């Protein structure tokens, strides 16, 4: 199979939301591949890391497919979705029935802990508003936009937060470092705003992302 010049590869992690993520991208562009093939992933213009379930099970799947080191070495734009974002951190406190923390990909220096919902129901499920930054992933996304969330664990606010949300506490709705970006919400379930965020990601390649990140912020 020949690799196209402008391709998006969704990593086949075996998770349940692969189809919905793929369909969301296919509504915007045709060149979307779901694969765990190392050569295809490395050659892609951009890569998506989806995930649902527990961090431990998801990381075990990546290890079984020998994908951990490959993902850590990617230089093109990479988008983690929901659990995919959480796997980009250093450590997750979501034990998934184990007694130890889950070591993650270590791409963004922050951790995952249980969401302090201040007595509100968990998981945090449904539509909620975000406060986005000037990061190119959120180009044209107004403050207060609603996106769809389903999660019980969260990444705290830090220098790597590029969008925030509040549910009991304020947490990172999206994080980024260099070419790695992650969103806690489900853009594939978030109607027009979610599609716009995916379109923003599809507009990125290594050169354009590097240029955007080097622009001075007003």
Swiss-Prot record:
Pathway: Amino-acid biosynthesis; L-histidine biosynthesis; L-histidine from 5-phospho-alpha-D-ribose 1-diphosphate: step 5/9
Catalytic activity: 5-[(5-phospho-1-deoxy-D-ribulos-1-ylimino)methylamino]-1-(5-phospho-beta-D-ribosyl)imidazole-4-carboxamide + L-glutamine = D-erythro-1-(imidazol-4-yl)glycerol 3-phosphate + 5-amino-1-(5-phospho-beta-D-ribosyl)imidazole-4-carboxamide + L-glutamate + H(+); L-glutamine + H2O = L-glutamate + NH4(+)
Chief subcellular location: cytoplasm
GO CC, any one term: cytoplasm
Ranges of residues in domain Glutamine amidotransferase type-1: 7-211
InterPro entries: Class_I_gatase-like, GATASE, Imidazole-glycPsynth_HisH
Catalytic residues identified in the record: 82 (nucleophile), 186, 188
GO MF terms held by the record: glutaminase activity; imidazoleglycerol-phosphate synthase activity; lyase activity
GO biological process, one term: L-histidine biosynthetic process
UniProt-listed Pfam families: GATase
Keywords carried by this UniProt record: Amino-acid biosynthesis, Cytoplasm, Glutamine amidotransferase, Histidine biosynthesis, Hydrolase, Lyase
Subcellular localization: Cytoplasm
Membrane-spanning intervals of the chain: none
Enzyme Commission number(s): 4.3.2.10, 3.5.1.2
Family annotation (NCBIfam families): IMP_synth_hisH
The protein's assembly and partners: Heterodimer of HisH and HisF.
Function: IGPS catalyzes the conversion of PRFAR and glutamine to IGP, AICAR and glutamate. The HisH subunit catalyzes the hydrolysis of glutamine to glutamate and ammonia as part of the synthesis of IGP and AICAR. The resulting ammonia molecule is channeled to the active site of HisF.
Name of the molecule in the record: Imidazole glycerol phosphate synthase subunit HisH
């Amino acid at each position: 199979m020949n690799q196209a010049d402008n391709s998006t590869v969704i990593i086949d992690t075996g998770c349940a939301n692969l189809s919905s993520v793929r369909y969301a991208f296919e509504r915007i562009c045709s060149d979307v591949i779901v694969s765990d093939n190392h050569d295809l992933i490395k050659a892609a213009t951009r890569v998506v890391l989806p995930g649902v379930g527990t961090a431990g099970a998801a990381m075990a799947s990546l290890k079984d497919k020998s994908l951990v080191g490959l993902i850590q070495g990617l230089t093109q734009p990479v988008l983690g979705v929901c659990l995919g974002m959480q796997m980009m951190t250093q450590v997750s406190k979501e034990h998934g029935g184990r007694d130890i923390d889950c070591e993650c990909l270590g791409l963004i220096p922050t951790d995952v802990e249980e969401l302090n919902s201040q007595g509100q129901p968990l998981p945090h499920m449904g539509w909620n508003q975000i406060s986005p930054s000037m990061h190119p992933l959120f180009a044209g996304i107004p403050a207060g936009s609603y996106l769809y969330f389903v999660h019980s664990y969260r990444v705290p606010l830090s220098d790597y937060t590029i969008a925030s949300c509040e549910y009991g506490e304020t947490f990172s709705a999206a994080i980024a470092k260099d070419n790695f970006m992650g969103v806690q919400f489900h853009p594939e379930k978030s109607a027009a705003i979610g599609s716009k965020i995916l379109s923003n990601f599809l507009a990125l390649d290594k050169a354009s992302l590097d240029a955007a990140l080097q622009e001075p912020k007003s």
